[in-house]
Amino acid sequence: MYGDGPSQIVEHDYGEFNGPEAGQSIEIARLAREIQSLDYKTGPAVICEAWDQDPRFHSTDPETLSPVRIGAQLELLLEQGQLGDSTLHFQSRSLAFSTATDDRLHKWGLWVAGSTHIRAALRHAITALRRARENPDFIKELWPYN
């Protein structure tokens, strides 16, 4: 992302929070603060799925709106200072899913079997990093303290 060399992901980790959405949001905030205090001078960039309007979408499954509710809770936690120095960014689901397709995740060695939620999070992370590499202003939005 910085410099002219080829980009590579040198290390990544993943996990999944379960249970009530409020609890998941609180755990995301705790993890963001923990990562900052352990390794970095600045907080991590938290990327959250933005709700894309799709006229073909007709699901009545309440879980499909879970990212919207968790995103709203993370906004509240950010406002309350519970995300430390992290920044919170919303990104289009369709952009993330078209950038980091299943085939590309396999090719990059980042495919995680089983959880669609973990794969969705990886898609958003990769997409945000690619956007940052292409746009220095976006890097400053993600990590304004660097």
Which residues are covered by each model-predicted region?
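Phosphate- and other anionic-substrate recognition elements at nucleic-acid/protein interfaces
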Residues: M1-N146
